[in-house]
């Protein structure tokens, strides 16, 4: 298998207020007929990635029922699979996922059994349409160990994001989380392609109990001058992890698609969902 997609879909979503009171963030309805998770799943399916795992944790029932066998996204085929990965009890330790990378680390045996060449790590609460094949193409051309999707943002808003500084070849020189005086406008989208051996190396050697990609894994790889690059994405993307951003994303749909940059009904890149 070439690519295994792992979608982080266990966030409690307290900043979404009552919307996520009885369901996990990615299971929250969006634009009437969709769920937020539909975007990451449809992007995988449209990109030809049919081996997908969802890492769930908080109130997973609604999400599990929505996903089912994965048929709307073509994950029920003989050469496809979709797996729900819940945290499990470990000897002498907390079973809950403690950080983004810890969630992946707790499923390290799953990755080893799948034995993919690359692991694509996604967030389950973003609204966007992206062909991951272009990102993978750049990853291979750069002979990268890790490629991170970034979006250029207005420099006056850059202090709200994790920001990367890169050289002329887009190799990452520095990363700073929410800098007071940003030196770049390349904001992290929380989308990563790892070479599997590099991912496993860092999951196994970093001992932080709350292991996180932004706080621990990425800074360590940059500090050790590993081959870490960015892939620039400049189309519509919205992290809907807060009530305000969720409302903004829904209001964006009132505008003309050419103004906003996203069309939910474009037949060339469909967003699939479960038919109730």
Predicted features and spans:
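Conserved N-terminal catalytic core of the sugar/cofactor nucleotidyltransferase
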Residues: 1-7, 15-21, 29-123, 127, ...
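Left-handed beta-helix
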Residues: 1-4, 197, 204-276
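Active-site glycine-centered loops adjacent to acidic/histidine catalytic or metal-binding residues
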Residues: 11, 125, 242
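A structural signal for short hydrophobic beta-strand segments in well-ordered beta-sheet cores
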Residues: 27, 163-166, 230
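Glycine-rich beta-alpha junction loops
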Residues: 59, 89, 153-154, 179, ...
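Residues that scaffold the ATP/ADP-binding catalytic core of kinase and kinase-like folds
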Residues: 66, 175, 201-202, 249
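Conserved core of the sugar-phosphate nucleotidyltransferase
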Residues: 129-197, 204-206
């Amino acid at each position: 298998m070439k690519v295994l997609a792992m979608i982080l879909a266990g966030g409690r979503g307290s900043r979404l207020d009552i919307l996520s009171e009885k369901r996990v963030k990615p299971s929250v309805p969006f634009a009437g007929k969709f769920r937020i998770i539909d975007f990451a799943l449809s992007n995988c399916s449209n990109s030809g990635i049919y081996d997908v795992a969802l890492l769930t944790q908080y109130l997973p029932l609604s999400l599990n029922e929505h996903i089912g066998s994965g048929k709307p996204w073509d994950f029920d085929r003989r050469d496809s699979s979709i797996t729900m990965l819940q945290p499990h009890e470990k000897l002498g330790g907390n079973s809950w996922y403690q950080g983004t990378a810890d969630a992946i680390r707790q499923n390290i045996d799953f990755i080893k059994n799948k034995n993919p060449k690359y692991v694509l790590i996604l967030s389950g609460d973003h609204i966007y349409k992206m062909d991951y094949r272009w990102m993978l193409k750049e990853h291979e051309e750069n002979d990268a160990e890790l490629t991170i999707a970034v979006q250029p943002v207005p420099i006056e808003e850059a202090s709200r994001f994790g920001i990367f500084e890169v050289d002329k070849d887009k190799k990452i020189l520095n990363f700073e989380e929410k800098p007071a005086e940003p030196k770049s406008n390349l904001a992290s989208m929380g989308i990563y392609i790892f070479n599997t051996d590099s991912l496993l190396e860092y999951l196994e050697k970093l001992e932080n109990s709350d292991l996180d990609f932004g706080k621990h894994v990425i800074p360590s790889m940059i500090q050790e001058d590993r081959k870490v690059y960015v892939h620039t994405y400049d189309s519509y993307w919205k992290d809907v992890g807060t009530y305000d951003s969720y409302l903004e994303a829904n209001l964006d749909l009132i505008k003309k698609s050419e103004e906003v940059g996203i069309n939910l009904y474009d037949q060339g890149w469909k967003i699939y969902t479960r038919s109730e």
